[in-house]
Amino acid sequence: MGNSRICVLGSGSYLPGAPVATDQVEEVLGRLDGLNDRLASRLDQFRERLLLRSGVQSRHFAIDPHTRRQTETNASLAEKAARRALEAAKMEASEIDLLIFSSPAPDCLTPPTSALLQERLGIQRCTEIEIHSNCTGVPKGIQIALDMLRQGRYAKALVTYSQLSSIFLRSEFYNTSHVTLEHLTLRWMLSDGAGALVLGRDGQGPDRPEMLDAYVESVGVGQTPGMTMELGAQPGPDLAHLPTPYILAIYEAGRHHLWQDVSKVASQAAELALSGLRHMLDACHCDADDIAVYILPFPGQHFISDKHRDMARRILGTDIESRAPFLVTEFGYCGGAASLVQFDRMARAGSFKPGDLVVAYVEESSKWMSGGFLVRWGANGFS
């Protein structure tokens, strides 16, 4: 069973609510009051410069702009993307025997969101697996599904990823007395969305898209995290003396905020992604010149500079810019879901030609990981 051909039977994606234009972001997420004077004086200019450099024209948030109520959960976002993938595959949810859900923040610590998604889809019996991960959650989920399908343990797998960034970007989440620019950078980069793939083994015909491989690597040993959010079972060393529960202390110290080492990410993220992509292509015995489409969903266009183009040529040995359409500007950077959203959009638009090799690759700065997946497009697509 190890050499079974695994097909991509369908893809789906979902973006909540109406598109939010750049000049509406603060209105939807809410203005941050109570910032210190020095930060407040710099904030408007910093935000406008960052939003302009990103090139993102619109994004989506699961927030009702009038009532400020949350309109989705991770499970509901994933369900909508999954149903679209199942529809593309012409399958019922009951045919799925392996369900994989990935997200950086589950809806609750227990039960797992994967089981909540199973409930929503009405799958009476299946194996469900939840992966806690940021951007590399998609290739991790695909790799697990791919190996299990090839082993013959399962016949049909549904791989989903959901990113509900707005829960920790909205103004009500912040303790503004402990906010720095490093806490706010991602506020104007991230958005909400979900994606899904249906994978199946054997008997799908030679004209179906084929999932050739998935790849993940973690290279952050000895490096400090590039992104943190201290909500979990173990507080930081300086808070370890506190009795549990310590959630209030975490909030009062502002340690619940999403923080990113902006300078380190700016200097390392692109090389991390491109080096990982090189390793993946080598592992797949694939030449960079053979790839027809590169899906590389960075948070914004400011990650695509002359320096990065030169870096890509040096690491990959070829110029990939003409083969790397950057669609994040159209729908927003919804974290790990962005690769699936772009893949789904391009598949539905007929952007892939029979025989095209399509690679999607992402990097995750939390502890310096990266990963991706490789598809050979089929003549019949999902039909």
Which role does the model predict for each range below?
Residues 150-193:
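Flexible, glycine-rich active-site loops centered on histidine and acidic residues
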